[in-house]
């Protein structure tokens, strides 16, 4: 499900359908599966997110057409990270799988095939292989094409620093 349409041109009902599929369904399915996994003391949830979950600060020509889709994927990534933290010690693992473009019919649905020469496309079997390897390695976020794992660690470190710096009780001087 995707709505690659500028938000102002997107039917609010269609946007709501995307949120229902990409956000509400992820929560409901996770909530339904977790009790049995916790009781067994083992299990794994793999939530399919996207590299677009990291795109909020990008200034790229195609980004304005993906606000709802990218926001739902940002939810999936953050939800998965925080759920994994909540479940530490239970034997249940959670992973946000964040591929870029994968060779599926996904992009053909709206009549805009993505298979152009300048777009790197990963094979579905490779995405699955990366996800399962990431689970074995304990990765909460799996980015199949990311060679340098330190880049993901740098993002986490930057997020922690921003979170800590932004928790003051007084306005920053630029807002006074």
Residue ranges and their predicted role:
Residues 6-7, 14-17:
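Substrate-binding pocket helix/loop in short-chain dehydrogenase/reductase
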Residues 99-109:
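Short, flexible catalytic-loop segment of classical short-chain dehydrogenase/reductase
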């Amino acid at each position: 499900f995707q709505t690659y349409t500028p938000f102002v041109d997107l039917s609010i009902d269609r946007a709501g359908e995307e949120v229902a599929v990409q956000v509400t369904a992820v929560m409901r399915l996770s909530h339904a599966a977790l009790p049995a996994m916790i009781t067994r003391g083992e299990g794994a949830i793999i939530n399919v997110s996207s590299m677009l979950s990291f795109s909020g600060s990008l200034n790229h020509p195609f980004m304005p057409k993906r606000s709802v889709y990218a926001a739902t994927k940002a939810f999936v990534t953050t939800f998965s990270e925080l759920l994994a933290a909540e479940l530490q010690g239970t034997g249940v693992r959670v992973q946000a799988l964040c591929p870029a473009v994968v060779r599926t019919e996904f992009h053909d649905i709206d009549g805009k095939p993505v298979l152009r020469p300048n777009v790197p496309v990963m094979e579905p079997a490779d995405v699955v292989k990366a996800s399962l390897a990431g689970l074995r390695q304990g990765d909460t976020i799996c980015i199949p094409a990311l060679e340098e794992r330190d880049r993901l660690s740098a993002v986490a470190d930057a997020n922690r620093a921003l979170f800590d710096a932004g928790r003051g009780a007084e306005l920053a001087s630029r807002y006074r």
